[in-house]
């Protein structure tokens, strides 16, 4: 695995200095670049992020229902939001990608950026424990937590379905067109077919659910144009 450049600058951007910098390098390494890739860290970070955001919402909204809390959490931890955070950090400049992913523009792909954010969260947890990880994640989410409310927090698939129903159009159809990797570290490619769009919209992520949500989010953006 090749060293990743400008680590000090990235650490300043993240707001965290790693005790073991190899953890950060590991978190930024895509499966296309090395057998020692970031998918296990991503798995860990996904779970930790969910706990941190769940806890924050639980205390911030003492009167919110379980459904409201779940929808707000889904909004805050979805691939679209994680990619937004990753782009703010300019993570694409630091990713370790294989030649094929570099050529296809993987450093701009939302799913790869989102997965790297989760992997960094997992790396911080291993490096410093849950409390420092919690403080860091909450600093990333401070402005987002400040504006979120327990209303209209619907995931992209639900919003797309409701939009099409409002126009009395057929519901979207999701189809898995490719699954790569071993059972514990798979990448799913999903096509979303919407009658109003000239061609299917594609979502790529580490689970079918995430890939469908990414495809639905992109379909929504296209429908708004």
Swiss-Prot record:
Its cofactor is Mg(2+). It catalyses: Endonucleolytic cleavage to 5'-phosphomonoester. Keywords: Cytoplasm, Endonuclease, Hydrolase, Magnesium, Metal-binding, mRNA processing, Nuclease, RNA-binding, rRNA processing, rRNA-binding, tRNA processing. Its EC number is 3.1.26.3. Residues 7-129 form the RNase III domain. It is found in: Cytoplasm. It holds the Pfam family dsrm. One of its GO terms (biological process) is regulation of gene expression. InterPro entries: dsRBD_dom, RNase_III, RNase_III_dom, RNase_III_sf. The active site is at residues 46, 118. The keyword Cytoplasm applies. Residues 155-225 form the DRBM domain. Homodimer. PANTHER family: RIBONUCLEASE 3, RIBONUCLEASE III. This is Ribonuclease 3.
């Amino acid at each position: 695995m090749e060293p990743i450049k400008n680590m000090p600058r990235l650490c300043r951007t993240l707001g965290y200095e790693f005790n073991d910098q190899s953890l950060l390098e590991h978190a930024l390494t895509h499966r296309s670049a090395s057998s020692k890739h970031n998918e296990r860290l991503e798995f860990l970070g996904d779970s930790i992020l969910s706990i941190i955001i769940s806890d924050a919402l639980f205390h911030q909204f003492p009167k919110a229902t379980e459904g409201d809390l779940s929808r707000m959490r889904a909004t805050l931890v979805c691939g679209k939001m994680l990619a937004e955070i990753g782009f703010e950090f300019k993570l694409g400049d630091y990713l370790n990608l294989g030649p094929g992913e570099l050529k296809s523009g993987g450093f701009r792909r939302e799913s790869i950026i989102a997965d790297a954010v989760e992997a960094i969260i997992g790396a911080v947890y291993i490096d410093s424990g849950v409390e420092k990880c919690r403080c860091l994640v909450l600093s990333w989410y401070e402005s987002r937590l400040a504006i979120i409310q327990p209303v209209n927090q619907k995931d992209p698939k639900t919003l797309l379905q409701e939009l099409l129903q409002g126009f009395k159009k057929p519901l979207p159809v999701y189809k898995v067109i490719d699954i790569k990797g071993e059972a514990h570290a798979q990448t799913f490619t999903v096509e979303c077919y919407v009658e109003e769009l000239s061609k299917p919209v594609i979502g790529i992520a580490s689970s079918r659910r995430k890939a469908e949500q990414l495809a639905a989010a992109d379909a929504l953006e296209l429908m708004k144009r």
